[in-house]
């Protein structure tokens, strides 16, 4: 009995010491976080984080990225501390070194799974590893080379429909509509072996899939507050009850998202069944399909059939990848392409020089190899510089699953004047990945870091950029992230941008007349007016005459 009492007292003492040490540790961590500079909060109740995540948050995002240093303290509801991190060493810890510790928030993972199903971006751990292992080969450079002729064939159709519109003279065209339709057709043929859009001028030929996708981003931003409580909502009753609640929920944006999800899911399942049946029927049936069996999903189906039981994906995950591929490849690339065309319209000298390079190389004719296209210096510079200054996705968050420490490349001066060399981060702290802040860091890129200057890529980059070891997978940029959760399709996106620009800039001149407002969302999108409802980017277009 005495031994048991001693043991109980010992356990009690150990627990007390552990609790005191943990509270002391958390107190120290929160003290450091309170000392980190950051923008003022309008309200303890609401904080200032929604100023960052709101549709019109670009000015606030720029203020956060430029005026408070490489680690910035933001405030969530009820005084919750949030960090914005653009320091290279800290980003390396989050993205590479301790990527298994710093994961997406539960609300983000649930959102992805509700939108697409059990897909790559909505999975963690072994499930994510297995999915990525199967997907990696189809996004290799070698596979991109095989798909290049198909890319040109699609964009030649885009060229013809625009040519028909402007052959009689200059005309205003919504380039976002056409880059979106082209992007959907490219991922349709190259990704799914399916034609979504014949790219003809009459709107009746358009696919409802594309219209649904364009409506999704604005709708998601309008229900951001609901998304934050998804971890609780998905636990309310059985699946049929949650579906019924969604069907009758009195909110237009929720109904828009529901319609998009239903459209994607239905079409993905139809295409999957067709492809599976064709593969079972043999090579001739596969060759009769749009992608002739060379598209991403046909290759994935064959690879999955041959995979070991441990690496094989269930059909539900294969269908989920299809919905994810279409969504991810459509808006990000098409919106970036529209932004590039806007910038070329604003910088006519760069547009003229790019056209000269493209005409001399013949890149707009399709008689260029993949390697030749990728190496065109000014074309490459225009793409890189746009992705640097205008990354399409900036709402990226990570959460540590345990207490962690972020080392810093350079010390931060605290509000009380003390030097902060590393930042202790308590478990569960939200960390906004400073994509824009890293991409325009003046200490790395120079005093002109905010300026769109493609010529900076035509000579060696500043030594500070190369020495910083920025953990991005693409060109010392954080635009496509890095590590095991980097954007798997960035090579697909890069090739698409270059083919579209090669063909369109070789044949047309683009000018800007209307003021364009870029809105914050999962993928930023343009409107003509500040509060415009419809994503669009109208430019004056005319045929180029040498």
UniProtKB/Swiss-Prot annotation:
Pfam families membership: p450
Top-level lineage group: Eukaryota
First and last residue of the signal peptide: 1-22
Pathway it works in: Secondary metabolite biosynthesis
Protein residues bound to heme: 487
KW Cytoplasm (keyword) present: no
Gene Ontology MF: a single term: heme binding
Keyword terms: Glycoprotein, Heme, Iron, Metal-binding, Monooxygenase, Oxidoreductase, Signal
Cofactors named for this entry: heme
Keyword Signal: yes
EC number: 1.-.-.-
Residues bearing carbohydrate: 367, 441
Family membership: Belongs to the cytochrome P450 family.
Main function: Cytochrome P450 monooxygenase that is able to use testosterone, anthracene, carbazole, pyrene, phenanthrene and trans-stilbene as substrates for oxidation. These multifunctional properties against a series of polycyclic aromatic hydrocarbons (PAHs) suggest that CYP219 would play important roles, at least in part, in fungal metabolic systems involved in xenobiotic detoxification.
Protein name: Cytochrome P450 monooxygenase 219
Native organism: Postia placenta (strain ATCC 44394 / Madison 698-R)
Taxonomic lineage of the native organism: Eukaryota, Fungi, Dikarya, Basidiomycota, Agaricomycotina
């Amino acid at each position: 009995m005495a031994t048991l009492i001693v043991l109980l007292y010992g356990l009690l003492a150990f627990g007390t010491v552990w609790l005191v040490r943990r509270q002391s540790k958390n107190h120290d961590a929160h003290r450091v976080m309170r000392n980190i500079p950051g923008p003022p909060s309008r309200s303890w109740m609401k904080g200032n984080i929604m100023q960052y995540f709101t549709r019109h948050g670009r000015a606030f995002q720029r203020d956060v990225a430029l005026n408070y240093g490489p680690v910035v303290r933001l405030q969530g509801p009820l005084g919750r501390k949030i960090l914005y991190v653009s320091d290279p060493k800290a980003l390396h810890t989050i993205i590479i070194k301790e990527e298994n510790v710093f994961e997406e928030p539960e609300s983000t993972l649930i959102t992805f799974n509700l939108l697409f199903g059990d897909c790559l971006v909505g999975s963690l751990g072994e499930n994510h590893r297995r999915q990525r292992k199967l997907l990696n080969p189809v996004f290799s450079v070698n596979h991109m080379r095989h798909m290049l002729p198909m890319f040109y064939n699609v964009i030649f159709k885009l060229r013809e429909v625009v040519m028909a519109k402007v052959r009689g003279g200059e005309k205003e065209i919504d380039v976002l509509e056409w880059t979106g339709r082209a992007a959907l057709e490219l991922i349709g043929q190259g990704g799914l072996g399916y034609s979504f859009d014949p790219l003809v001028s009459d709107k009746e030929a358009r696919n409802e899939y594309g219209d649904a996708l364009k409506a999704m981003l604005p709708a998601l931003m309008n229900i951001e507050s609901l998304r934050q409580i998804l971890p609780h909502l998905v636990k309310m009753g059985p699946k049929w009850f949650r579906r019924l609640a969604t069907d009758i929920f009195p909110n237009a944006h929720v109904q828009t998202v529901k319609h998009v999800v239903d459209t994607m899911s239905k079409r993905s399942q139809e295409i999957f069944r067709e492809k599976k049946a064709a593969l079972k029927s043999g090579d001739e049936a596969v060759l009769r399909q749009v992608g002739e069996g060379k598209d991403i999903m046909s290759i994935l189906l064959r690879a999955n059939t041959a995979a070991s039981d441990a690496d094989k994906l269930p059909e539900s995950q294969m269908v989920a990848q299809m919905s994810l591929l279409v969504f991810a490849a459509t808006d990000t690339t098409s919106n970036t392409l529209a932004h590039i065309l806007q910038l070329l319209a604003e910088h006519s000298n760069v547009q003229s020089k790019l056209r000269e390079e493209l005409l001399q190389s013949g890149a707009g004719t399709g008689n260029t190899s993949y390697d030749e296209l990728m190496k065109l210096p000014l074309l490459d510079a225009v793409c890189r510089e746009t992705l640097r200054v205008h990354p399409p996705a900036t709402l990226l968050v990570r959460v540590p699953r345990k207490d962690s420490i972020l080392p810093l490349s350079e010390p931060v001066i605290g509000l009380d004047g003390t030097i902060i060399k590393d930042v202790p981060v308590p478990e569960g702290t939200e960390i906004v990945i400073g994509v824009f802040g890293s991409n325009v860091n003046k200490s790395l890129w120079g005093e002109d870091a905010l300026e769109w200057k493609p010529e900076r890529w035509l000579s060696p980059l500043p030594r500070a950029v190369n020495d910083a070891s920025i953990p991005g997978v693409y060109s010392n940029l954080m635009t496509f992230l890095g590590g095991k959760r980097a954007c798997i399709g960035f090579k697909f996106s890069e090739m698409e941008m270059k083919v579209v620009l090669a063909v369109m800039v070789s044949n047309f001149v683009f000018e800007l007349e209307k003021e364009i407002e870029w809105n914050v969302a999962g993928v930023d999108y343009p409107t003509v007016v500040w509060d415009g409802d419809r994503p669009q980017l109208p430019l004056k277009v005319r045929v180029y005459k040498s």
